């Protein structure tokens, strides 16, 4: 009809900051929408019916937060995203990267070192460079496969030995 209408209406009794969290990824010619929401108290991904505006399923769930959506692949029905707080016993502020199917199955950790990761993907998302570090650890860069997170090769490992020796 060409008449605009509300598909998704988010309301909360508490303050919700969305300025840096807006994820609205239409897929399947707009018949579905990947949407980021804090509706369960944590920042997670949901699959919406793009025609009716109803939640079809919650893609991610748990006591952890999705930070950012990196890529939505409608053909493979996969999402690559960053998150924090997912790994028990680890600093909850460390950022890790994951891949998951639209139906919430097949979660694959793409990063594993207990550190904050910065990832740069190849244009086809088949491989990526994972650079990770902590305040007590110099950066390490590795080339990895997106299919399973396997390390293909270490690219670089910084060393602070000379600085520590110099005092």
What does each model-identified segment do?
Residues 51, 101-103, 147:
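Solvent-exposed strand-loop boundary residues in beta-sheet-rich modules
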Residues 1, 23-40, 49, 59-60, ...:
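Beta-strand C-termini and the immediately following turn/loop, strongest in propeller blades
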Residues 5-6, 44-51, 55-61:
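Polyanionic (Asp/Glu-rich) segments that form extended negatively charged tracts
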Residues 1-13, 17-23, 36, 68-72, ...:
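Non-catalytic accessory segments flanking enzyme active sites
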Residues 11, 37-39, 49-52, 63, ...:
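Short, flexible loop/turn elements at secondary-structure junctions
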Residues 2, 31, 43-45, 54, ...:
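Repetitive beta-architecture junctions, highlighting loop-to-beta-strand starts
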